[in-house]
C-alpha cells in the first residue's frame, strides 16, 4: 500500500512523496485523511531547522499531528467501524522517513486506539484538538489556577482563554499585533504596553518568546505563578531578586495527555467548547509548499488547514 505524504527533506524544503504503508495488524485501522493542520509551534521549528536536538530527530521526516480522516478498513480486533470520522494525533507508520510526527499524509495505518472518534459535524475543525488538549492540560490538573493573564492571542492563546471563561474566569490577553486582538468572546485582548497591572495571580505565556520572563515576573502578585505553555527554542533566564521578592512560581506545561484529548473532544461534542473562528486559511494538500510558507510567514494566518480529499 502507498500513501502520499508531505516530507521535509531538509529545513525549508518539502515534497509530496509516495511512501509505503505497513500491512494492517488485527487491531489496526486504515484511514483516508481528509484534513490536516499545520502547527506554528513545533512544526515551524522542524520546518526552519531550529528544533533543539532530541532522540529520533532528523531528516527526511513526515510532519503533522493534527489529522482528521475516515476509517476505510479495520482489522478483526479493531475497536472502530468502517466509516467512522476520527482524529489522529500523529502516526508511526512510515519506514522511509522519520515520523515527526507522521500525520500529514493521504492515508495512514494506525492502532485503532490511536484514532479517536469525533462528531461528524466538526469536519476540518477536528484538526484543532491537539491545541485544545494542550490548552486544557495547562490548567486542568488538581490545584492549578486558571490564568488571569494570557500572553499571545494565536490559536493556543484563544483556546486557553475560552477554557478559562468556561471555567468561570475573566482573563486578560496580551498581543502586540493589532490584527490579532479581534475575535475575543468573554474576555479582553489588549496591547501589553497599555497594561499597568502588577498583581496577576497566574500568567500563562504561549508566545514562545524566551526573553519575556523578567517582564512577566514583574507583573505577578506575591505568590503568583508564570506558566510556560509555549515552546522555546532558546534558553530562558530571569533576574532573581524580583522573583525572590514575589516568591514567584514558574511552571512548565508540557504536551497533552490522552485524558486531556478525551476531555476536549467531549467538551466540543457537547457544544461547550467552541472551535469557531480559529481556522483562517485553507489550501489543497498538493500546494503544501505554499501553504507552509503562508502558515509561517503571514501574520494574518491563525491556522492553515490542508485538504487531502483530492489526493490519492
Model-derived regions, located:
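C-terminal hydrophobic helical "lid"/dimerization subdomain
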Residues: 1-3, 166, 214, 258-312
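Glycine-rich beta-strand-centered segment in the early N-terminal region that forms part
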Residues: 22-38, 50-92, 121
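Short, well-ordered coil/turn residues at beta-beta hairpins
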Residues: 35, 89, 204-206, 308
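NAD(P)H dinucleotide-binding glycine-rich loop of Rossmann-like/cofactor-binding domains
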Residues: 86-151, 161
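Mid-domain Rossmann-like dinucleotide-binding core that forms the NAD(H)/NADP(H) cofactor-binding site
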Residues: 125-193
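Short acidic-hydrophobic, aromatic-tinged amphipathic segments that line or gate anion-handling sites
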Residues: 188-194, 282-287
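A short acidic, Gly/Pro-enriched loop at the edge of an enzyme's catalytic core
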Residues: 195-203
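Glycine-rich phosphate-binding loop and adjacent beta-alpha segment
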Residues: 210-270, 308-312
